[in-house]
A protein has these predicted regions:
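Cytoplasmic C-terminal tails of single-pass
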Residues: 385-420
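Subtilisin-like peptidase catalytic core
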Residues: 1-39, 89
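Extracellular S/T/G-rich loop segment that most often corresponds to the catalytic His/Ser-adjacent loop
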Residues: 14, 80-180, 184
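Alpha-helical transmembrane segments
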Residues: 373-387
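Long, low-complexity serine/threonine/glycine- and acidic-rich segments characteristic of extracellular
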Residues: 247-359, 370
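Structural recognition of the beta-strand scaffold that forms the well-ordered cores
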Residues: 26-31, 53-56, 61-65, 86-89, ...
Length: 420
């Protein structure tokens, strides 16, 4: 506790003899489990978990090992149960360089965390991510010849590597290394943006364990196996677009599939969206950094509540898009900011448009080459099934009126209400 408090107290300390960019402390990598002395493990209210929450809130991103109690573990220990920290499970890569055969390590503790009774099912979804933790070669820690005594302050410059080891204590430092790369790429990322980027870019593994709460989280892998390349790439994108501090980590927009529809010939991107703590106000897209195009919709029976999902589908006529790599960017908007952006690269068949604006003005009357459907899903975490809410344009007349009055919406040619 005192050690973590010292880190928090020195998060901005100007260390002597180093450049200002190296001042303070940015990351905690923790492989220390605390027995909670409770059946079912900790619910995150123990003092060790709570001080890690404070560290995250102070801007220090925390990577903490999930534990090594295997699939039948009795919950997670203190620290690994922290509401806000990044809890890390371990995978076994089978001694291959491919990721397809990676499995959850037999020893890796599984989720979820014990319920703390606060009515929010999201903070029980532990671990957040997984990383390689099996048969990992380790740096030599000894600083003297002979016995390994790890003298503090000793000269370890001649140390090499020693034996291999396994455990979530090897996975958590790997995630800490990725976090360091993300900070190097974008020093202005917040701790919560980094956590969300890791979850968002992770390679999905396993079937969803609690699909009514989250459609991707799995009790073994969390939101998936970390992808360092994609995490750093998205960090750079946020830097280049000036999005630091503008990301609402509770606004979720995800692509589920993208391919050419054989019947229509259109390139179709399908996905889902929802708010974890509120509602999604709009979904927008743009082409090649052009203007953002919004989707008009009306809401029935009030606003969508937290965790209520809807599906969206975007269809593009490739004949209207230039024969080059074109960037399609999609985002969701809420009262508190925007979701992490999704970028898909497609190649057109020969049009000359290179921006959202020119793409719109190529629209021909009565030609439906771009379609954006908004459909409310009936996936409610609180098991509500009556009177599902819908996003819709109520008639063809309404559509025509919208297109006439708002040219920014000219590419929206249809939307229909689906009743549950």
């Amino acid at each position: 506790m005192n050690g973590i408090q010292w880190i928090i107290d020195n998060k901005d300390t100007a260390w002597a003899g180093v450049d200002e960019s190296l001042h303070g402390i940015d990351i905690i990598s923790l492989s220390w489990g605390i027995t909670s002395h409770e059946g079912g493990g900790s619910d995150g209210s123990d003092m060790h978990s709570m001080i890690l929450d404070v560290a995250m809130e102070e801007g220090i991103v925390v990577s903490v090992a999930a534990g090594n109690d295997g699939p039948n573990n009795d919950g997670l220990s203190g620290m690994g149960s922290s509401d806000l920290s990044i809890t890390v499970g371990a995978t076994d890569d089978g001694n291959t360089i491919t990721r397809d055969d990676d499995t959850i390590a037999s020893y890796s503790s599984r989720g979820p965390r014990r319920d703390n009774g606060d009515g929010n099912p999201l903070n029980e979804l532990k671990p957040e991510v997984t990383a390689p933790g099996t048969n990992i070669i380790q740096a030599e820690g000894c600083v003297t010849s002979g016995g390994c005594n790890n003298l503090l302050g000793g000269d370890a410059s001649s140390n090499t590597y020693t034996s291999r080891g396994s455990g979530t204590s090897y996975a958590a430092p790997a995630v800490s290394g990725i976090l360091a790369l993300m900070i190097e790429a974008n020093p202005n990322l917040t701790a919560f943006e980094m956590k969300e980027i890791l979850k968002f870019t992770a390679e999905r593994k396993g079937e969803p364990t609690q699909p009514d709460v989250d459609p991707f989280w799995n009790r073994d892998f969390g939101w998936g196996l970390v992808d360092a390349y994609e995490a750093v790439k998205l960090s750079i994108k946020l830097r280049d677009q000036g999005l630091n501090g503008l990301i609402d980590v509770n606004t979720q927009v995800h692509v589920e599939s993208s391919s050419i529809d054989n019947q229509s010939g259109l390139y179709v991107i399908q996905g889902i969206a929802w708010g974890q703590m509120g509602s999604v106000n709009a979904i927008e897209y743009r082409i090649n950094d052009g203007e953002w195009m919004s989707v008009a919709f009306e809401q029935t029976n009030g606003s969508l509540s937290a965790l209520e999902r809807f599906s969206w589908s975007l269809a593009l006529d490739l004949d209207k898009i230039s024969m080059a790599n074109n960037s399609i960017e999609i985002r969701g908007l809420s009262d508190d900011g925007q979701s992490l952006p999704i970028t898909i690269t497609i190649q057109g068949y020969g049009g000359v448009s290179d921006s959202s604006e020119s793409f719109i003005w190529d629209l021909l009357p009565n030609t439906m080459f771009f379609v954006l459907f908004i459909i409310v899903g009936l996936l409610l975490w609180n098991s509500r099934t009556e009177n599902p809410e819908a996003l819709f344009l109520d008639s063809n007349d309404s559509i025509a009126k919208v297109l006439k009055e708002d040219k920014d919406l000219a590419s929206v040619v249809d939307a229909e209400l689906l009743e549950g």
